[in-house]
């Protein structure tokens, strides 16, 4: 779901992702940095493009001119691990969006609602 205050998205980690080979042999788990990147792609990047499109009243055909960059992460905490093949839900709640800068409180959870990790992410959005 998506509106001007929040976003919800999902991602399933494929069992053959390259990073599982070394993290860890015999017991693969999704690296924390990949979990942060997943939260950033949904919570900061996609959300930022949507908010800019709403703000500038862009048509869908103009959205390919938007550039959204993940710019910072703060206070991420991990409560669980993500196994290969697992589907996660990412939820982002807008703190603010001003002058192309988005600050969002983001959580990742399992399909059953159990929280995996959370933190504050920021992104910068520009119209090229």
Which residues does each predicted region cover?
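Catalytic strand-loop segment that frames the active site of acyl-thioester-processing enzymes
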Residues: 1-30, 34-35
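Generic beta-strand hydrophobic packing signal
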Residues: 2, 73-76, 119
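HotDog/MaoC-like acyl-thioester-processing domains
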Residues: 4-6, 81-128
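Generic structural detector for well-ordered beta-strands
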Residues: 10-12, 77, 122-124
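Charged, amphipathic alpha-helical interaction segments
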Residues: 14, 45-48, 97, 111
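Active-site- and interface-proximal helix/loop "cap" or "latch" segments in soluble metabolic
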Residues: 30, 34-51
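Hydrophobic beta-strand-centered segment that forms part of the acyl-chain substrate-binding groove
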Residues: 44-89
């Amino acid at each position: 779901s998506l509106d001007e205050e929040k976003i919800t998205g999902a991602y399933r980690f494929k069992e053959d992702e390259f990073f599982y080979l070394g993290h860890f042999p015999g017991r693969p788990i999704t690296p924390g940095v990949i979990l942060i990147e997943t939260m950033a792609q949904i919570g900061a990047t996609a959300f930022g493009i949507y908010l800019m499109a709403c703000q500038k009243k862009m048509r869908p055909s103009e959205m390919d001119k938007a550039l959204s960059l993940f710019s910072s992460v703060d206070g991420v905490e991990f409560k669980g691990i993500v196994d290969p093949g697992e589907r996660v839900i990412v939820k982002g709640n807008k703190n603010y969006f001003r002058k192309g800068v988005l600050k969002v409180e983001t959580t990742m959870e399992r399909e059953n609602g159990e929280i995996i990790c959370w933190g504050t992410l920021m992104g910068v959005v520009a119209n090229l």
